Every structure is written in structure tokens, then in C-alpha cells.
Amino acid sequence: MELYFLRHGKSVPRSDWDGDDESRPLTEAGVSAMAHAAWTLARLGVTPDVLITSPLERAQRTAEIVAPALGLEGRLSTERCLGKDFGMKQLRRLLRQHSRAGSIMLVGHNPAFTTIIHKLTGGHVALSKGGIARVHLAARKSSSAELVWLLQADELVGLASSNSSPPSVAAQDTEAAEPAQD
């Protein structure tokens, strides 16, 4: 089984947001970077069977940007357990629920993702906002796995820029984004 841990894109800083943390959106730069990332992931042949996202706005938006590029429209699901308290117990439950899938992409948050990757692989990783890690899990019940690759957000954007122009996100998709500072 292949697991992709995609951390949500760059979001509006808490200090600049008057609403609750759950509704904090991506910045305009975060939306743009995730569009580049989605294009790069498609070019790399990333084709998960299932895309599962946290219910928090910034993760939802990230998943909405990535899904069409990876051919996952209609296969996006939201799981409350992918919120900030996501851990091994919740991961095992998701793996059981999607036992027929060969690969799963999870869109969520740190420190949960880096903690789980460490528990699975034994390695310490840093996962930037908009970064992704691919982990190979040999057996679904195993707590042992291999980190196949890790791409930070700037690497995904760089790969997109070096190949050709990735598609931009439609103007309507960026209207909800807040200022690009942070």
C-alpha cells in the first residue's frame, strides 16, 4: 500500500485571521503553490485510488485543488479524524475502511503527519506546508514502512516551473484566499 501524506498549502496566519482556526483559508500564494504542486504530482504519475481530507478549510481547499489534476474528482472524502489530533489509531481505522485501495492520499496537518511518518519509518522528517511524503507500507497491519520520497512545497513548484507552465487556478478559486503574506 502506498500512502501519500500531503500537508495543506500555506494558510492565512492565525494572527491575521479573526475567525475560528477551522475556517482559516489558504493564502493566494498557497492556492497558487498548490496548483503548481497538483500539476507536478500529476506529471510524476501520482494516482492514488482514494483522496481523504481533513475537515478544516485549508485542507479541504488543498484537496479541491489537487483532486482534478490527479483524476480524483468524485473520489474526495472528508474524515473528521484527519483533524489536528490525527494519530496511528485513526490511520489504522482509515486503512481498514479503505482496505481495497492500493494507494491513499491524506490531506492534513502537522505535527500529526510528521509524527506518523516517524512512527511508521523510524525517520525524522520535516514536511513544509504544501509538501508531500510518499510512504510504502508493506503490510496493512504493520507499523513498519519505508519513506519512498519527500518533496517540499518549493520543490514541487520548482519542478512545475522547470518543465513548462502549469495550469493556473481559475479566478473564482482564488477569491476566498486572503493576503499572500506570511
Annotate each PLM feature.
Residues 2-80, 85-86, 123-127, 163, ...:
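Active-site-proximal alpha-helix that buttresses catalytic centers in soluble enzyme cores
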Residues 62-66, 91, 116-117:
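Hydrophobic packing residues within well-ordered alpha-helices of enzyme cores
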Residues 83-97:
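Short phosphate-binding loop-to-helix
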Residues 97-133:
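Non-DNA-binding regulatory cores of transcription-related proteins
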Residues 121-146, 152-156:
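Domain-level recognition of soluble alpha/beta enzyme cores
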Residues 144-182:
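Charged phosphate-binding loop/patch that engages nucleotide di/tri-phosphates or the phosphate backbone
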